[in-house]
């Protein structure tokens, strides 16, 4: 049986929750990182790249949990974590993303509009952004590509064209992942082969429909607090992507954050102070899901 794992976007907080979820599952003997194919979008591209390179979920989670000590130290010293900066307000961006995903307007044209906004925004420079990923995306491995099946997504900032980075793309892993994580207005578009690329989540939060051709596809999605109508509107595109997978003969399993995880996220997935709590919640959810998921994955 061929197995695929799809990891969705969700900012720094989403990275923490996904790492915790995977660690909790692995602790109970369910190794989603052993998938034949891993597809990552935005936050999921980073987590997926680590899995594809053989990094243990437990190690990812441990590094995130250690951040709690730094946050506590900053508060005790009377300073604010994250350099005193408030997490960015992305309400306008999210509204455009919803337009692109809902079909209200031509998705490619909306993505071009988002790309224009990203290209004009004042952000850190590209190299500083890539370096911010730390040693996990540095050195020789960052210039190559995982031997295991791995792909991540991006969008051309000028044309709105969607891009799927794979081993055949002949692109360095660090730049591919950075482009997938380039949240418009927050991080810089990334230059690859003379083009500028932004977050693959501008097409879809998960791009799960691209994982066709596998018998079992586990999709790890994200959701945040909101009323029922908002939640349904955000989930509808994902359900359509799952239908594409099932129409291709795949069995699908969808994992979404439980209520405890959503509470741990807070209101802004870009708020790095929430990462340790999100990771802990993910670990607890992973442990709780393990018995059920083991029956289909193992």
Could you tell me what each predicted segment is?
Residues 1-41, 46-298:
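Patatin-like phospholipase
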């Amino acid at each position: 049986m061929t197995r695929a794992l799809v990891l969705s976007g969700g900012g720094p907080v989403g990275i923490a929750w996904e790492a915790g979820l995977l660690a909790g599952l692995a602790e109970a003997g369910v190794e989603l990182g052993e998938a034949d194919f891993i597809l990552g979008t935005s936050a999921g591209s980073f987590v997926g790249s680590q899995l594809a390179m053989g990094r243990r979920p437990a190690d990812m989670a441990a590094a995130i949990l250690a951040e709690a000590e730094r946050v506590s130290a900053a508060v005790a010293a009377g300073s604010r974590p994250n350099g005193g900066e408030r997490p960015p307000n992305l309400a306008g961006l999210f509204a455009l993303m919803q337009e692109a995903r809902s079909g209200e307007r031509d998705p490619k044209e909306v993505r071009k509009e988002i790309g224009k906004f990203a290209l004009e925004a004042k952000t850190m420079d590209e190299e500083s952004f890539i370096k911010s990923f730390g040693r996990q995306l540095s050195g020789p491995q960052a210039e190559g590509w995982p031997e295991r099946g791995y792909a991540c997504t991006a969008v051309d900032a000028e044309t709105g064209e969607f891009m799927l980075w794979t081993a055949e793309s002949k692109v360095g892993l660090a730049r591919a992942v950075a482009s997938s994580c380039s949240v418009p207005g927050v991080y810089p578009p990334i230059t690859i082969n003379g083009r500028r690329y932004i977050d693959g989540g501008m097409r879809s939060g998960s791009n799960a429909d691209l994982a066709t051709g596998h018998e079992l596809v586990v999709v790890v999605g994200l959701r945040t607090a909101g009323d029922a109508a908002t939640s349904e509107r955000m989930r509808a595109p994902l359900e359509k992507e799952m239908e594409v997978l099932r129409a291709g003969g795949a069995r699908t399993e969808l994992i979404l954050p439980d209520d405890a995880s959503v509470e741990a996220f807070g209101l802004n997935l870009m708020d790095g102070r929430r990462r340790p709590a999100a990771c802990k919640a993910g670990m607890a959810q992973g442990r709780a899901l393990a018995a059920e998921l083991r029956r289909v994955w193992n």
